[in-house]
């Protein structure tokens, strides 16, 4: 097998694992939510709790990822996570009992974390070991692709008149198809500390202060992300002037996210990772607010494109940075970052669901998301400013060191 073909198959396995674990097992719930509310009697409060339970599962999965160090165990958990994604997708269509849905959403969250963190770690580790550029733009295109696929599928199945159960079973069939290459083309991990060419792969962790601020910023980004990602279909479906367009808007999120990660990789090369993250955070605030600032389908779609293009880009940049700090065990810091992101995702949907039950709609949640994103973006801007200053000081410090050495 040639190196180019190997890289293609590894990246394809990673992309399809994200389409399965995140797009189908996790995000199909969002475009199906209005249908389940109409046909299965799912209330707005219960919808929020189910979303939170899913994110709790994701949070637990992230905790496990941050603690697991054995590469072989990571590989096994990645594969078990994808199988869990298939089983839990099927379970959603089998029963109408809320407790069954809750268990299913929790395990789906575990599977999503496994595919996201262990799968991403395996891909990044393989790229670094084989002396490829340590960028995950193509890989994280699977998140946007998964969102687009689930939204387009729900739109098509709604036109065919399929009920909520049939749609979950259709997604189960898709999940089975995706599982085969996602498992077969992901290579077993290599636990050595050098690349194939013999170059060392030393871990270079950030300072505790940097990590604390970075975690806080990512927590805020988690709030900004999860409210829109979970409730945007229900929100848009109830807005005057754009009612019934929620699934189309969700499709736009996926369309915006699929190619965006590659673009953000290019922006990061010019601005640095932190500069790209700061810009993405600012644009995401605009994307969150556009659907509710004016009852216009054009603005709602533009907001969705911005939201999808920035949220997936931010996740890609953050997890790529985390993996570079720990190239031999990329999932270690990825798990810590995702714990922060996941904690926000576990809290915010339940609060949004409660607010929706109180106020009668979900729009208050979007304003909360925008405020949280503003705080997170400010923290990222602060880290970027410190990074710029340190980059400017580095040559001067090196020159001083050389001058001192020369004078001895």
Where do the language-model regions lie?
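C-terminal transmembrane helical hairpin of 12-TM major facilitator-type secondary transporters
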Residues: 272-321
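A late C-terminal transmembrane helix in Major Facilitator Superfamily
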Residues: 328-361, 369
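Helix-to-loop junctions at the C-terminal end of transmembrane segments
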Residues: 61-73, 260-272, 356-357
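Cytoplasmic helix-loop-helix junction between adjacent transmembrane helices
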Residues: 104-142
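Helix-loop-helix hairpin linking two adjacent transmembrane segments in secondary transporters
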Residues: 98, 129-187
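Extracytoplasmic gate region of multi-pass secondary transporters
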Residues: 30, 210-251, 255-259
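Helix-breaking motifs and short loop linkers at transmembrane-helix boundaries and internal kinks
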Residues: 41, 73, 94-100, 294-295, ...
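Conserved MFS/SLC helix-loop-helix module at the cytosolic interface between two early adjacent transmembrane helices
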Residues: 60-97
